[in-house]
Regions:
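Solenoidal tandem-repeat scaffolds enriched in leucines and small polar residues
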Residues: 183-275
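Hydrophobic beta-strand positions that form the internal "hydrophobic ladder"
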Residues: 96, 133-134, 173-175, 216-220, ...
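Non-cytosolic head/periplasmic domains of membrane-anchored proteins
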Residues: 114-222
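Intrinsically disordered, low-complexity segments enriched in Gly and acidic/Ser/Thr residues
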Residues: 281-372
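Sequence/structural signature of beta-propeller modules
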Residues: 1-77, 83-84, 400
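A short beta-strand motif characteristic of beta-propeller blades
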Residues: 66-81, 110-118, 150-157, 195-201, ...
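Repeated scaffold domains used in trafficking and secretory/extracellular systems
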Residues: 30, 76-90, 119-131, 161-170, ...
Length: 400
């Protein structure tokens, strides 16, 4: 009897010893399958990135917006706002800033109101930097700094006279160009924390625009003057801390529209050409418009500028052009459709036609299309390949 019990015990131990490896092997097999699946997914992502970075953005959007409910066209209503013809829009990250003659509001990516303020702005304008944006009144003395969380500081007290222009670079250095008693105009530079780092007073010429360059060590200012009996804009670059220009360049016979940056170069957009300078003032390149009328521009692409040109003062004979940081034309696209708005960001260019939205690559190959957009008035491109459509009182996010 005891021998029988011992035999049963021995068999039971043998079964347990044989079963344990099988359980371990099953767990190992499942683990290997999980690892294999992850490797496959990683391989797909790497292959997409190797083939086309926009495909990688598609994968990112798949995960970022997988819980967002889209309509059959792939768009989502973001928020609603007052129907005001004075509305000015800008994106700070994924937050929408709306400034009008009656106030400022910031909406999150989910459409909730992050901050709202009632304030009188005669000519509202927005300048966007890296993490902050300046909302100001052209010709007035109101200046607010916002982050995605809301109002950061009220800098209205810094304005000794009426504001002429404001710019914010990618490191959130701000250049305030304003009138000043005893001078034609004055430019003051503030760092990201709002501390004053440089002041420049112009006693002979009016400063049209000023920007802090990407290295945050230099400032570029454009003054309006005269050369050989014709109007001429002078582009001067100063080291912060010195009121003596390191370099001076003259743009003769053209009207400066804005200063900006393309791939770290200083971009001077005029009514006739796009001229680019390096940080030391050396000419990097220039692109003269093939069509005489500039209808739109965007300098927010990755290492390129997007320009919308027109053959005639009015009409729909258009040419969309991308220009590299050395002034070379990258691609061009002719169009006979009416263009309402154009915006570039990262590797994408959004063009809003009268009845459709088309997203292009920098080579002006069509990337995505949304038809039936008669409700939209303007568009703002985002770096992840999504675009914000702006209507009279609502905004939508288009997710390709």
């Amino acid at each position: 009897m005891n021998d029988l019990k011992e035999e049963k015990g021995t068999r039971e131990e043998l079964r347990r010893s044989q079963a344990a490896p099988r359980r371990s092997g099953g767990g190992l097999k499942r683990a290997l399958m999980v690892i294999l699946a992850l490797v496959v997914v990683l391989a797909v992502v790497v292959a997409a990135a190797w083939k086309d970075l926009s495909s990688l953005d598609s994968v990112r959007r798949l995960f970022s917006y997988n819980k967002v409910t889209q309509d059959e066209q792939g768009k989502v209503e973001l928020c609603s706002f007052s129907n005001d013809r004075s509305n000015t829009f800008a994106l700070l990250g994924d937050h929408l800033i709306v400034a009008s003659t009656t106030g400022v509001s910031i909406y999150s990516s989910s459409g909730s109101v992050v901050d709202s303020m009632s304030v009188k702005l005669t000519n509202p304008a927005i300048a966007v930097g890296g993490q902050t944006a300046a909302v100001y009144d052209i010709g007035g003395q109101t200046l607010f700094i916002y982050s995605a969380s809301g109002l950061v500081r009220d800098m209205s007290g810094e304005c000794s006279g009426n504001i002429l222009s404001v710019s914010v670079n990618s490191s959130d250095y701000l250049a305030l160009n304003a009138e000043k008693s005893g001078y034609k105009s004055a430019v003051t530079v503030y760092d990201a924390s709002g501390e004053k780092t440089f002041a420049f007073n112009s006693s002979e010429h009016y400063v049209i625009d000023a920007v802090v360059m990407r290295d945050c060590k230099r400032m570029a200012a454009v003054t309006l003057g005269e050369s050989d009996g014709t109007f001429a804009d002078t582009v001067s670059i100063y080291s912060l801390g010195s009121d003596k220009a390191d370099s001076v360049n003259t743009l003769t016979g053209s009207l400066l529209l804005s200063l900006d940056s393309v791939a770290g170069t200083l971009s001077c957009l005029t009514d006739e050409s796009l001229t680019l300078f390096s940080s030391d003032g050396t000419l990097s390149g220039s692109y003269r418009y093939e069509y005489p009328y500039l209808r739109g521009s965007s300098m927010d692409g990755d290492n390129y500028a997007a320009l919308l040109l027109s053959r005639y003062r009015s009409g729909s004979t258009m040419k969309l052009v991308t220009v590299s940081s050395d002034g070379t034309e990258m691609a061009s696209l002719d169009s006979s459709q009416e263009v309402l708005s154009m915006s570039a960001a990262g590797k994408y260019i959004a063009v809003l036609y009268s009845d459709s939205l088309v997203l292009y690559t920098p080579q002006l190959q069509e990337y995505a299309r949304l038809d039936g957009t008669e409700y939209a008035r303007s568009v703002i491109m985002r770096e992840d390949g999504t675009a914000v459509l702006i209507g009279s009182s609502s905004a939508w996010l288009y997710i390709p």
